[in-house]
Amino acid sequence: MNQDKRAFMFISPHFDDVILSCASTLMELMNQGHTCKVLTVFGGCPSVRFQPGEIARQYAAEDLGLFEDEIEGDHLSILVARRLQEDQQAFRHLPGVQVEVLSFPDAIYRENKGQPYYRTEADLFGIPDKQDEDIFLPKIETYLQSCDLARKYTWVFPAISKHVDHRLLTKAGLRLMSQGYPVLFYSEFPYWQQHNEFLQDGWRQLELRNSVYTPVKRAAVLEYKTQLLGLFGEEAETKINNGGVLSEAELFWIQETDTQAWRVFRSLSPEPLQT
């Protein structure tokens, strides 16, 4: 690869996170000749013994258009399959971006002897379960390292969401960085609309805007049909098509000393805003 061109690995906790947060940036990176891959980590189905908790039922009912008391284990696997299909359709709008989906289950599906770690929304946006920290996170880190034995990638991890899956991956990104991997972070949309603090020393935020890609980003987001109600409320498709709801801004966190990353990312937007 040309020394001026780089390979980027974007880490998406769930099927929609990178498209919502980074789609325009991905497209401009590809346009400039860089290589981009998206690795969706929590794309697996729950185990057959899993008994859905309150939050799993709530989300599945909302996504599938059912009542909560109708939700059974099979519905969860149906939902995961549908979300995977939506993700594949979304990335057809971004030709050239490589995509890989891992089989680690979403937080709301993780369990011990059939019982969920995270039963409520408060649990889901709280502190990661000790078993996730001690057992699950090291497995994720080991897999991520196996993807880059030649250390050719610049890794782009989620930064600011309080969702336990995002928190685990933020920690994984910091650990990879401590081992010498080049790492930067992105603020997850729509979470950054309420909270946008990356509590690490030596990092600065870069805001990118590139309106030329907005129509394609909008079309890609619209493919995530099961998620639109939960993300954007009633008449979400109309709001998106009318130019509302989505943000043109895409936010990244880059180490102050990473001159290569700053050079590449400042070139991606007509007027990048450093804060």
From Swiss-Prot:
Record family assignment: Belongs to the PIGL family.
UniProt keyword list: Antibiotic biosynthesis, Hydrolase, Metal-binding, Zinc
Gene responsible for this protein: btrD
Role according to the record: Deacetylase involved in the biosynthesis of butirosin by mediating deacetylation of 2'-N-acetylparomamine.
Any one Pfam family match given in the protein's UniProt record, by short name: PIG-L
GO terms, biological process: antibiotic biosynthetic process
Cofactor: Zn(2+)
Organism: Niallia circulans
Recorded superkingdom: Bacteria
Cross-referenced SUPFAM superfamilies: LmbE-like
Name recorded for this polypeptide: 2'-N-acetylparomamine deacetylase
